[in-house]
Amino acid sequence: MTMCVSIGHGDQRVIQAIIDQAQELPYAAPGMATRARAMLGKKLSEILPAGLTRYLYTLGGADANENAIKLARGYTGKFKVLSRYRSYHGATFGAISVTGDPRRVVWEPAVMPGVVHFLDPYRYRSTFHRNNPDISDEEFCQDYLNHLEEIIQYEGPDTIAAILVESVTGTNGVIVPPDGYLP
C-alpha cells in the first residue's frame, strides 16, 4: 500500500490538533454547523477572491473530488472531465475513474463515463523529450500545454465540464510541474 501525506508524518502539532478536535467533537455530518467549520469559513473568506462566499465541506479528498465533478457537470451542463495520467484523486468510484495511474485499470471498463486522460509534464519519463533532456523548461512546458490543447480540441471544448489537476502529483512520485504549466 502507498500513501501520500503532504503534511508529513508524526508532526506533534498535527497530532495535538487531532486530539483536541476528537475531545471537542469527534464527528460531524457534512451538513452540520461546527466551530471548526465556522473558523475555516472565516479564513477562506480572508484568502479567497471576493465573491467566493459559499463552501462545501466534505469528508475527505475523494469525496471532495466526486462533489467537484458533480458540481462542474451540473453547473456547465457538460459531461467530460479531463485528468492527467499519473494523477491520484481517491479510491471511490468517481475518484478512481479520474485517477490517471494503473490503479484504475482493474475497474475498467466499469469506470465512470466521460473521463479523458492526458499526459503530464514529467521530465523523468517525458513522452515528448526522451531523447532531448536538455530542452528548456519553457519549451518543455509549452509542448505539454500544446498536448492538452490538442486533447481539448479533439474531445470538443463544448463537451468538457472540468479539468481536474493536482498542483503537485503526490503518490505517483511527487511530480512538480515546470514553471508556467499552472497559472
Predicted regions and their residues:
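A short, flexible beta-alpha/helix-coil linker loop
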Residues: 2-3, 24-25, 122-125, 167-171
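Glycine-rich phosphate-binding segment of PLP-dependent enzymes
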Residues: 2-31, 41-56
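PLP-dependent aspartate aminotransferase-fold enzymes
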Residues: 42-161, 180
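Conserved PLP phosphate-binding loop immediately N-terminal to the Schiff-base lysine helix
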Residues: 164-180
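Alpha-helix capping and helix-loop boundary segments enriched in small/acidic/polar residues
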Residues: 32, 135, 139, 172-176
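Short beta->alpha linker loops
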Residues: 32-35, 59-60
